[in-house]
């Protein structure tokens, strides 16, 4: 047979084609202590002991390949990127580096993996073929950044006994993308190299474990080794008042107006005096004036009258929105003086005035047997004008915290009731985050502008100091900072990326503890902002359906959450609501939940619900939510007002009586284990570092467990050194 002859032009063409094509590199094998990693340099597909864990990307040209027994590196010339893989025990460290700005895709979920675990809030584990999760993730979580949208910068995948976890040691500038294809969720990951991160390396740790919490525990170990994890015990040692959080339920006290209807002792006299002042009546709406004319006003009419009266009081001495807490406290004192002079003989003693944060409410909490509470005020004016209540609450051992925020600045006069957004115009303009188009980044709700936390730090220090001094609070809830929300800021005066912005948020929060000695909480309590925080709200029940009109806008919808009215008990916080089946499954179904966050931070940050989603918001699943909180050993959160004490206080007492003794026993213990006891997730067990166990039966049927009968909707409590007991919901 004659040999194949190739003419010179054809040969040249073939050589050029071969050079242009990706250079196929043989798969690399790295042998760990018990695991064998197979890595394709051209696609970055990865298998562990012959199980594929990343399908990688389309093939890329490879050069400069070097390899050793425990590591290898190579170059992707077309992407101007360098790749390094290195064993760390049985973990694999993957490092990507690029000297030029670019987005670099590196991971895709292989088809053999059937379940994903992620911390959108506390933690979820779901099938990639579940129809509810296909809809929820596809519609609301299709694109996630890993420093903000994920509360832990990791995800796990499994298809059986072993769990494969991707832990982002570089949590910034990453994006996860979900797509839907063939009735299955597909997941991919990419990293952005830019001038904001100065092309710093992206490092991810791939770890293998035998249970669903393995990745979270490995992340905790890594944080501790890096000095980025701090125990509650250490935090309390620096600020002893923090110990008041042990066993404490969390309560928001609503209503910051000066007077409540229960402060009136002579209704006929009040009606007569108001009707004698035509100028005063101009502050009352038509409906309020009708109530004022009633012979014997019913409670609902009294509430209307008080709304008009409080508006009248505010109009007599307007609050200087731009002048800060000290000036505002002086105006609030003048209002009290004005009311005493004009109406004092018709009212109870001034010490007992008030709506949410008031002496009668504090006394009611004490008389109900509630010994440990965190009390928050949604507006700092309540704390400024209710000194008697603040002092009484702290004497009883409660924490009293005000809400504050430095995230958005609005123009003067645009919304004077939004006190935290009243940032001096010069600071608001100078510190506004600038988008790539050169325009300020719109603030919360599209109003004003979002602010760079580093730029506003001097102003924030000054105002927080004023607030602490003027109000006497011993706690502070600093909104947004704990979420790790960050973006690239193109403002030449303070240009920075996500990592620097989150560092600035942490610096602001750390200052509160170091200088003001306040017990600090914030929203979410993201892993990247956990170190300065003692508590946070938003992980146990996280926000969902933000764009769902049936929940947010359509008042006749059965799923409507409520209006932001009335001020003393806004419907959105107090009105019972139903859940759409999608959210009942994805956000609240115990079988779809996983204590990932608690496995990392149970003994570091106390975490509860988002204030829009308190324990009483959804009556249909009230028992399941309470039981899940006990299983995870996390505090309940309840919205309360003076007018809702009768209906809500017994619920708070029940929740607190069950939670407090468990938390007092377990607050400083790590959550180290979790398992289903029935195979379907209706009976679940958590295990703590001292050997204590909690077992929750979410079903309506009894089950025999280790020789013990566990009825439906009950919690089995097996604390170290104590007899086994049962709690009923």
Regions found by a protein language model. Give the residues of each.
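Bacterial N-terminal signal peptides
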Residues: 12-22
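Carbohydrate-recognition beta-sandwich/jelly-roll modules
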Residues: 26-373, 385, 391-400, 404-406, ...
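Active-site-proximal substrate-binding groove within the catalytic cores of carbohydrate-active enzymes
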Residues: 39-46, 186-205, 209-213, 258-268, ...
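An acidic- and aromatic-residue-enriched active-site/binding cleft used to recognize and process polar
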Residues: 99, 109, 377-382, 403-410, ...
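Active-site-adjacent "subsite" loops/lids of carbohydrate-active enzymes
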Residues: 340-342, 347-354, 402-466
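Accessory recognition modules or surfaces
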Residues: 361, 373-375, 381, 385, ...
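Short, basic, glycine/proline-bearing loop/turn elements
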Residues: 372-374, 447-450, 494
């Amino acid at each position: 047979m004659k040999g194949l002859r190739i003419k010179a032009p054809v040969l040249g063409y073939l050589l050029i084609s071969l050079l242009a094509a990706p250079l196929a590199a043989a798969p690399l094998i790295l042998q760990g202590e018990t695991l064998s990693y197979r890595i394709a340099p051209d696609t970055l597909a990865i298998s562990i002991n012959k199980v594929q864990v990343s399908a990688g990307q389309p093939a890329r040209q490879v050069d400069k390949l070097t390899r050793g027994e425990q590591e290898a590196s190579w170059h992707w010339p077309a992407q101007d990127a360098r790749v390094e893989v290195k064993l760390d025990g049985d973990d694999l460290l993957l490092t990507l580096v690029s000297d030029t700005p670019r987005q670099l895709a590196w991971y895709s979920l292989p088809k053999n993996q059937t379940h994903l675990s992620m911390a959108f809030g506390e933690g979820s584990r779901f099938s990639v073929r579940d129809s509810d999760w296909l809809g929820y993730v596809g519609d609301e979580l299709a694109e996630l950044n890993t420093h903000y949208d994920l509360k832990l910068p990791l995800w796990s995948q499994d298809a059986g006994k072993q769990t494969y976890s991707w832990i982002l040691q570089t949590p910034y500038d990453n994006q996860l993308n979900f797509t839907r294809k063939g009735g299955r969720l597909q997941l991919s990951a990419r990293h952005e190299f830019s001038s904001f991160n100065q092309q710093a390396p992206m490092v991810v740790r791939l770890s293998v474990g035998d249970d669903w919490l393995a990745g979270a525990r490995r992340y905790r170990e890594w944080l501790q080794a890096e000095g980025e994890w701090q125990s509650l015990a250490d935090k309390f040692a620096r600020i002893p008042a923090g110990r008041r959080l042990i066993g404490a339920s969390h309560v928001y006290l609503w209503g910051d107006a000066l007077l409540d209807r229960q402060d009136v002792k002579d209704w006929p006299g009040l009606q007569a005096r108001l009707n004698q002042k035509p100028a005063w009546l101009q502050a009352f709406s038509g409906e309020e004036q009708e109530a004022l004319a009633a012979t014997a006003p019913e409670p609902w009419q009294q509430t209307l009258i008080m709304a008009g009266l409080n508006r009248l009081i505010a109009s007599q001495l307007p609050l200087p929105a731009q002048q800060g807490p000290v000036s505002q406290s002086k105006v609030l004192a003048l209002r009290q003086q004005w009311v005493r002079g004009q109406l004092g003989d018709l009212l109870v003693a001034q010490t007992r005035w008030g709506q949410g944060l008031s002496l009668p409410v504090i006394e009611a909490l004490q008389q109900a047997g509630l010994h440990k509470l965190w009390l928050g005020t949604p507006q700092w004016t309540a704390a400024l004008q209710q000194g008697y209540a603040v002092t009484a609450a702290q004497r009883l051992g409660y924490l009293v915290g005000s809400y504050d925020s430095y995230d958005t600045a609005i123009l003067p006069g645009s919304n004077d009731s939004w006190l935290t957004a009243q940032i001096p115009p010069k600071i608001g303009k100078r510190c506004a985050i600038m988008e790539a188009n050169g325009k300020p980044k719109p603030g919360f709700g599209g109003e004003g502008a979002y602010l760079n936390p580093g730029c506003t730090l001097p102003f924030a220090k000054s105002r927080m100091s004023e607030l602490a001094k003027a109000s006497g609070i011993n706690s502070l809830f600093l909104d947004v900072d704990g979420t790790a929300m960050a973006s690239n800021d193109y403002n030449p005066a303070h240009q920075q990326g996500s990592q620097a912005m989150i560092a600035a948020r942490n610096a602001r929060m750390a200052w509160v503890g170091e200088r003001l000695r306040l017990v600090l909480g914030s929203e979410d309590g993201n892993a990247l902002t956990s170190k300065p925080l003692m508590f946070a709200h938003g992980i146990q029940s996280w926000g969902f359906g933000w764009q769902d009109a049936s929940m947010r806008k359509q008042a006749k919808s059965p799923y409507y959450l409520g209006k932001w009215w009335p001020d003393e008990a806004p419907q959105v916080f107090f009105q019972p609501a139903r859940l759409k089946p999608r959210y009942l499954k994805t956000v609240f179904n115990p079988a779809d939940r996983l204590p990932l966050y608690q496995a990392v931070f149970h003994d570091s940050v106390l975490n509860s619900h988002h204030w829009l989603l308190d324990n009483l918001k959804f009556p249909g699943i009230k028992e399941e939510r309470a039981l899940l909180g006990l299983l995870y050993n996390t505090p309940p959160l309840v919205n309360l007002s003076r007018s809702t004490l009768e209906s809500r206080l017994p619920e708070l007492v029940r929740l607190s009586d069950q939670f407090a003794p468990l938390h007092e026993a377990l607050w400083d213990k790590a959550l180290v284990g979790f398992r289903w006891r029935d195979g379907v997730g209706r009976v679940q067990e958590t295990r703590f570092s001292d050997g204590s166990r909690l077992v929750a039966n979410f079903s309506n049927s009894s089950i025999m467990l280790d020789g013990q009968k566990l009825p439906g909707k009950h919690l089995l409590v097996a604390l170290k050194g104590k007899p086994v007991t049962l709690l009923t919901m």
